[in-house]
Amino acid sequence: MVVPRATRIGLAHVVTRVVFGLLRLPLRMMRTYRTQDRWLRLAAPISVLAQLAIFVALIICGVALIVFGQTNLTWKQAGWQAAATVTTLGTTEPVNWSSAMSSALGAFLGLVVIAVFMGYLVGLYSAFVARESLMARFAQVAGEPAWGPMILARSQALAGSPIEALDCAEWMTWMTDVRLGQQASPVLAHFRSPDPTRHWTVSMLSMLDATALASSMGLVADRASAIRCVAEGTITLAVLRRRGAAIETTNWRTERMVLDILDGSAGIDPEGARSIDDADWNMAVELLQQFDVAKRSDIESARPVFSAIRSLYIDDAMELAAELHAIKGPWSGGHSGSVDATSLDDCG
């Protein structure tokens, strides 16, 4: 069993960033987001293979140095013997007893790297499936790309309650799994969803928006769970944006901020807290009215509270969406380099 641990500094971060940065260079020459998404699907597999190649190369260099110091072989001969032993080809004969021990060690390390790599791939696949399965089910009510108000509207239409689809406990588990998986394996963030209209950053943002909006309008039955859900999402986005670095924000501190906003003791600035323009907000209001989620006056009065809660996580969500080149959807279009989902109809 391979059990990796989170780290702020490591080869995985460097390789993933370099590969993804290089693959982003030709995106401007691609006309549609679907083409861009298909191209960026190469980033994660290339990063994984590059990590394997680099680790094997480092072991070969280390064994070559040992062999060179123990024998009269040249650098080229020592390097060839190290490469043959680490890759278990067995095409060279040890020169002396010490070089034979070094060759055996190199062969063992080569097998260990391959075994660990196979376990690593299994772990990546399991984490990817766990992340995508809930998102696929979530898309049935959130739409693709996911949108917070759509969750409340469809839930109201299907179940007669706008919060029926907001399973805060399930989403808190999902967010913690996403955070743990991507802290342990940074390349997991770059594995893209099978559908180009779906992305984990947009799904997380829409779920937080739906929970924050429902809480602002007083629709949630279990306010404590909703507050914990928003706090967990806020911290998850902050940690992933900082690539696992330690942050000062704690669960209780974030929960307290949300609680103060809902209770009206946080000194809300209606103008400064707004992160959604009037056109996008009115579109959501019309949708919620159409499905009888709430009266227009109740929705409008909840806007300052909702915007203040949203300000806790929106910057980190947008930064991650921009960095990962996520699909642009309603209320998630603040990052550059994406297109609106409606243009996907014309994609080839």
Regions found by a protein language model. Give the residues of each.
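Membrane-interface amphipathic/juxtamembrane segments adjacent to transmembrane helices
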Residues: V2-M30, E132-A146
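Generic structural signal for hydrophobic core residues of well-folded globular domains
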Residues: P26, G69, Y125-F128, M175-V178, ...
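Juxtamembrane/interfacial segments around transmembrane helices
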Residues: R31-D37, V95-V112, R154-E164
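Pore domain of cation channels
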Residues: V48-L134, D209
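Non-transmembrane accessory domains of multi-pass membrane transporters/channels
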Residues: S133-M204, D209-A210
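Soluble C-terminal extramembrane regulatory/interaction domains of multi-pass membrane proteins
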Residues: A142, A146, D167, A189-R192, ...
